[in-house]
Amino acid sequence: MSLFHLIAPSGYCIKQHAALRGIQRLTDAGHQVNNVEVIARRCERFAGTETERLEDLNSLARLTTPNTIVLSVRGGYGASRLLADIDWQALVARQQHDPLLICGHSDFTAIQCGLLAQGNVITFSGPMLVANFGADELNAFTEHHFWLALRNKTFTIEWQGEGPTCQTEGTLWGGNLAMLISLIGTPWMPKIENGILVLEDINEHPFRVERMLLQLYHAGILPRQKAIILGSFSGSTPNDYDAGYNLESVYAFLRSRLSIPLITGLDFGHEQRTVTLPLGAHAILNNTQEGTQLTISGHPVLKM
């Protein structure tokens, strides 16, 4: 089975019971879980001091265990504080041989983008310990797609997407929309041309989602892509004031401005049902009336 190494570079794990349940679930399945002490750390709202959380990341360069999955405990906020002090060069060098399979999402997007920007390091945007593996019930779809991505050099995700018929390919990248916005103009924002940009978010009203997407558009980032895929935007329920304005309104407005396909409906993000995507891998997108396919390759996988 697999070895999981936990890291907690972001928010304090307020759901300790869920973290313990996630660890138990993984060990019951025959996996080994290391570095479990990080789940109890706390400094204000963070999972430890800056020094402790930074060491979670920088110590990965010295990790010698083979075939290791690095799993973020949870998101929240905190990764942005660490970006300037991460030893990117050491992490990039470490990933050039026997790469760690680094997985997380939400606030962790900042770390993932930094690794991609600094050294084309591929990481996995997917489930985390508390919200997913520690849920009351582990979602079967999420579990299946996690192992699908980590065990197969080439794999395909299928869904019923909304958007124009298209077939294109490029570097798959993205993650949490708000975190990408926070990286614009910094050394940790990947400079991807002709890519396939995939985005998700949580607790953002539709107008805020639109505003962030427009910022990516006006910054020239969206027009430089081959396609955009939108995942889930949890907690984005409109109110009476919106008078019918919703996420579909956002999508329609963006499509009226973009000359590239925008495909929606992917189960990707903060919901219990989510795929796992290797950010920085090669992807082929095919959208027809029959459905949508995303075939991904070129990412590191577990050695079976």
UniProtKB/Swiss-Prot annotation:
It is an enzyme of class 3 (hydrolase). The keyword Hydrolase applies. InterPro entries: Carboxypeptidase_A_C_sf (IPR027461), Class_I_gatase-like (IPR029062), LdcA_N (IPR027478), Peptidase_S66_N (IPR040449), Peptidase_S66C (IPR040921), S66_fam (IPR003507). GO terms for molecular function: muramoyltetrapeptide carboxypeptidase activity; serine-type peptidase activity. Pfam families: Peptidase_S66 (PF02016), Peptidase_S66C (PF17676). One of its GO terms (biological process) is peptidoglycan biosynthetic process. It catalyses: N-acetyl-D-glucosaminyl-N-acetylmuramoyl-L-alanyl-meso-2,6-diaminoheptanedioyl-D-alanine + H2O = N-acetyl-D-glucosaminyl-N-acetylmuramoyl-L-alanyl-meso-2,6-diaminoheptanedioate + D-alanine. Keywords: Carboxypeptidase, Cell shape, Cell wall biogenesis/degradation, Cytoplasm, Hydrolase, Peptidoglycan synthesis, Protease, Serine protease. NCBIfam families: PRK11253.1. Releases the terminal D-alanine residue from the cytoplasmic tetrapeptide recycling product L-Ala-gamma-D-Glu-meso-Dap-D-Ala. Can also cleave D-Ala from murein derivatives containing the tetrapeptide, i.e. MurNAc-tetrapeptide, UDP-MurNAc-tetrapeptide, GlcNAc-MurNAc-tetrapeptide, and GlcNAc-anhMurNAc-tetrapeptide. Does not act on murein sacculi or cross-linked muropeptides. The tripeptides produced by the LcdA reaction can then be reused as peptidoglycan building blocks; LcdA is thereby involved in murein recycling. This is Murein tetrapeptide carboxypeptidase.
